[in-house]
């Protein structure tokens, strides 16, 4: 760790608590001999004298194993340090004095954050002393304390989120979340905010960097995604296609660093979760009494919700997400299954015209193809059954966007050259003798390309994420914590993937939508269990 031993600063008699008027730890510079004199008159404590500090009134996270405090300063300071006031709580500060044993002011702020420089602080009472270290990060900090073991069921927790001068302290609850990823060492979590310490009575809070919500998801990011950018990039581009008032619109995201019961857990992606009930209500309050929402899922990894087996794929099913009161009802899916089972193409097209929200299905497929989403058809797809006067119409929306941008899974290859199967849309395109579906597909494709998908957009976002991960010092800390080789983020492979997908898809989609003669063999294979087939045999 970097130590700048050139100067000292002290403060005496801290008597402050979060939210009250506070006094700074750092006072005028003192000579090193004064610190030595304080040491000589006291015994070194076997335990840290302070494990709770605030930076500018905002809680700091504490790595108990390494005795290191972390403070969030954001990434907008440049070389100039912001005013920093470290304080202890009233209970901790009784009889305790604190000072820096290193002067961070001798370093540039941005360099100190980027390189993860640590600065010693000296804590002492009349009889004892101890040292600790302080590290400043550019990312938000999430600090969770739970007395019970955290598993899939909710347990009460104390939650703190800090970003520069913004801070949140709240009661809440936490549980592990995820499918196959829950078996990894680095797992995801869901945090919900509550009024009471027992994790009851959910409430909304202002989340630093994210806005107001009652919950957040902390994604460990796919273990195979060494860039740590795929999920965030996908949602950012999808946000260019959806309005906030539109059902199942793009989710807000931000990187953060997580501390759990005093243990540093590395970099996570904080994600705004869907409240399915609220999303349904965006289409009109009357929908809450008529509609149902299901999520496709691999049954072995389902989330414990009521689930119906997919009649066309034994390993997968449809989980019920709304409504959750009363007996589980899967009858709204009957017309959808009947459509998928229709053997006559002409009859299939007539049924589809009556029961499928065509623009929803086509936009879903266009995003599927451009982003290379290989885990969003037989898994992780919302199927929304919208009932009007006894007639059901189906809309499709994304549940997550992580297995994307050429990410490998199940030895399927990098997917750069593959058309990703969505059997419903594949057949709509293949059986479209009149050409209207193909023409509309081309229109939506051009709209998505124009609004949300070109290499310049991708490159700009990837550059921003690399800045956040690298210049915050967080990527290197995550690599050290999880013993990976990914000490620096660049995301170049995502930019390369975007360029390859554009080159591969633009011409076939243009020709298909224009009614030109084109080899459509890539649409012919509709096995639900297949993830894709090459667009070109070259």
Describe the predicted segments one by one:
Residues 2-17:
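Hydrophobic membrane-insertion alpha-helices, especially the h-region
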Residues 33-44, 114-175:
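N-terminal module-boundary/linker segments of secreted carbohydrate-active enzymes
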Residues 190-192, 215-220, 228, 257-259, ...:
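Structural recognition of the beta-strand scaffold that forms the well-ordered cores
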């Amino acid at each position: 760790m970097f130590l700048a031993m050139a100067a000292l600063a002290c403060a005496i008699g801290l008597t402050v608590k979060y939210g009250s008027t506070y006094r700074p730890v750092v006072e005028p510079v003192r000579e090193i001999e004064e610190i030595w004199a304080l040491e000589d008159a006291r015994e070194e404590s076997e335990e840290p004298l302070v494990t709770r500090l605030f930076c500018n009134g905002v809680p700091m996270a504490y790595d108990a194993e390494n005795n290191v405090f972390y403070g969030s300063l954001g990434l907008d300071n440049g070389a100039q340090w912001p005013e920093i006031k470290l304080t202890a709580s009233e209970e901790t500060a009784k009889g305790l004095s604190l000072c820096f044993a290193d002067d961070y002011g001798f370093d540039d702020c941005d360099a100190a954050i980027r390189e993860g420089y640590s600065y010693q602080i000296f804590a002492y009472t009349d009889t004892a002393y101890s040292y600790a270290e302080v590290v400043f990060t550019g990312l938000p900090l999430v600090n969770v304390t739970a007395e019970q073991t955290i598993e899939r069921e909710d347990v009460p927790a104390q939650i703190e989120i800090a970003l520069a001068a913004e801070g949140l302290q709240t009661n809440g609850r936490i549980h592990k979340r995820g499918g196959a990823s829950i078996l990894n060492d680095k797992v995801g979590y869901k945090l919900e905010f509550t009024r009471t310490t027992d994790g009851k009575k959910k409430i909304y809070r202002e989340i630093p960097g994210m806005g107001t919500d009652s919950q957040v998801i902390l994604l460990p990011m796919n273990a195979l995604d060494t860039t740590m950018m795929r999920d965030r990039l996908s949602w950012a581009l999808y946000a260019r296609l959806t309005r906030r008032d539109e059902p199942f619109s793009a989710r807000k995201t931000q990187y953060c660093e997580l501390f759990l019961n005093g243990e540093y857990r590395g970099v996570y992606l904080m994600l705004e979760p869907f409240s399915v009930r609220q999303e349904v209500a965006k289409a009109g309050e009357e929908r809450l009494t008529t509609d149902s929402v299901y999520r496709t899922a691999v049954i072995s990894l389902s989330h414990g919700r009521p689930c119906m087996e997919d009649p066309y794929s034994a390993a997968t099913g449809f989980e019920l997400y709304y409504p959750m009161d009363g007996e589980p009802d899967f009858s709204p899916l009957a017309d959808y299954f009947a459509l998928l089972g229709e053997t006559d193409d002409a009859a299939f097209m007539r049924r589809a015209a009556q029961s499928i929200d065509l623009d929803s299905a086509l936009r879903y497929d266009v995003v599927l193809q451009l982003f290379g989403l290989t885990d969003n058809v037989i898994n992780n797809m919302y199927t929304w059954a919208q009932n009007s006067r006894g007639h059901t119409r189906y809309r499709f929306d994304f549940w997550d966007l992580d297995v994307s941008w050429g990410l490998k899974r199940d030895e399927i290859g990098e997917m750069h050259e593959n058309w990703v199967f969505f059997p419903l849309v594949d057949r709509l395109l293949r059986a479209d003798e009149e050409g209207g579906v193909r023409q509309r597909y081309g229109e939506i494709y051009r709209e998505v390309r124009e609004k949300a998908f070109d290499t310049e957009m991708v490159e700009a976002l990837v550059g921003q994420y690399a800045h956040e991960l690298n210049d915050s010092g967080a990527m290197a800390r995550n690599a050290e914590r999880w013993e990976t080789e990914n000490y620096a983020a660049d995301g170049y492979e995502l930019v390369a993937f975007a360029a390859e997908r554009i080159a591969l898809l633009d011409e076939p989609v243009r020709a298909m939508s224009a009614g030109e003669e084109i080899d459509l063999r890539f649409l012919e294979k509709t096995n639900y269990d297949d993830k894709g087939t090459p667009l070109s045999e070259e």
